[in-house]
From Swiss-Prot:
UniProt keywords, alphabetically: Developmental protein, Differentiation, DNA-binding, Homeobox, Nucleus, Repressor, Transcription, Transcription regulation
Residue span of region Disordered: 47-69, 199-277
PANTHER family tied to this protein: HEMATOPOIETICALLY-EXPRESSED HOMEOBOX PROTEIN HHEX, HOMEOBOX PROTEIN HHEX
Transcription regulation in keyword set: yes
Phylogenetic lineage: Eukaryota, Metazoa, Chordata, Craniata, Vertebrata
Function: Recognizes the DNA sequence 5'-ATTAA-3'. Transcriptional repressor. May play a role in hematopoietic differentiation.
Annotated GO biological process: cell differentiation; negative regulation of DNA-templated transcription; regulation of transcription by RNA polymerase II
Top-rank lineage group of the source organism: Eukaryota
Compositional bias segments (type: Pro residues): 52-63
Keyword match Nucleotide-binding: no
Gene that produces this protein: HHEX
Protein name: Hematopoietically-expressed homeobox protein HHEX
InterPro entries for the chain: HD, HD_metazoa, Homeobox_CS, Homeobox_DNA-bind_prot, Homeodomain-like_sf
Record PROSITE patterns: HOMEOBOX_1 (PS00027), HOMEOBOX_2 (PS50071)
């Protein structure tokens, strides 16, 4: 007849299944005596009696060597996963997050995963700058879309002063002015072409003010259209490049750009402004 242990009933009442095969534990007890009830239940000679009501069922542990009953000995339990301590900087944040119950459930059983991802993002961007947008933020300010450049205030003032006294420039004068303002001859020529187009438009809108300016500005310099024309005595055959007829033949679109007297399209074939009427 097989002897029934009195401690088997509480084990079955706790809902612990009896395994068909009992593996051998890693650690052996000091004095294995499988015929005593104390050894079967894992109680020592001075151990306190087990409580009648437990708050929660304990996890299943390794059984004893020669019995089919589950053992409740704590030293036989080996932890499967031991979480890494969380960094102190994230401990208060994670405590507040998981304390509210927003991430309650078996899917979020390891809170350290969220802290690891957050810490990885901080290590990736230590300075807090947008790494992906840096090539688009750092753009040159002196150039504009379409290859246009903007004249500085000093260059514009000098060009305006020259235009007040002289509406057309000869090639030597244009070269000298471009060297003085650190511009190309093409930019100076383009600026004067567009400035003359604007001047003609203002002349058509307000002819009285234009006549007054011509009387004051061109009184000492004479007719600007005779600038650069060869003298009859010289007999030269060279034709001025900045004369009104030559400018209209070389640059027929110079009258189109009226208002853009500070932006030059250096990429274009003729070098004129991109104007908006």
């Amino acid at each position: 007849m097989q002897y029934q242990a009195p401690g088997a009933a509480p084990a079955a009442a706790l809902g612990v299944g009896v395994p068909l095969y009992a593996p051998t534990p890693l650690l052996q007890p000091a004095h294995p005596t499988p015929f005593y009830i104390e050894d079967i239940l894992g109680r020592g000679p001075a151990a306190a009696p087990a409580p009648h009501s437990l708050p929660a069922p304990p996890p299943p542990t390794l059984p004893s060597p020669n019995s089919s009953f589950t053992s409740l000995v704590a030293p036989y339990r080996t932890p499967v996963y031991e979480p890494t301590p969380i960094h102190p900087a994230f401990s208060h944040h994670l405590a507040a997050t998981y304390g509210t119950g927003a991430y309650a459930g078996p899917l979020y059983s390891f809170p350290r995963a969220v802290g690891d991802y957050t810490h990885a993002l901080i290590r990736q961007d230590p300075l807090g700058k947008p790494l992906l947008w840096s090539p688009f933020i750092q753009r040159p300010l002196h150039k504009r879309k379409g290859g246009q450049v903007r004249f500085s205030n000093e260059q514009t003032i000098e060009l305006e002063k020259k235009f007040e006294t002289q509406k057309y420039l000869s090639p030597p004068e244009r070269k000298r002015l471009a060297k003085l303002l650190q511009l190309s001859e093409r930019q100076v020529k383009t600026w004067f072409q567009n400035r003359r187009a604007k001047w003609r438009r203002l002349k058509q809108e307000n002819p009285q003010a234009t006549k007054k300016e011509e009387a004051e500005g061109t009184g000492d310099h004479g007719d600007p259209r005779s600038e650069g024309s060869p003298s009859p005595a010289g007999g030269g055959e060279a034709e001025p490049q900045d004369s009104p007829s030559a400018a209209s033949q070389e640059d027929p679109e110079s009258d189109v750009s009226d208002d853009s007297d500070q932006e030059v399209d250096i990429e274009g074939d003729k070098g004129f402004y991109s104007a908006t009427r």
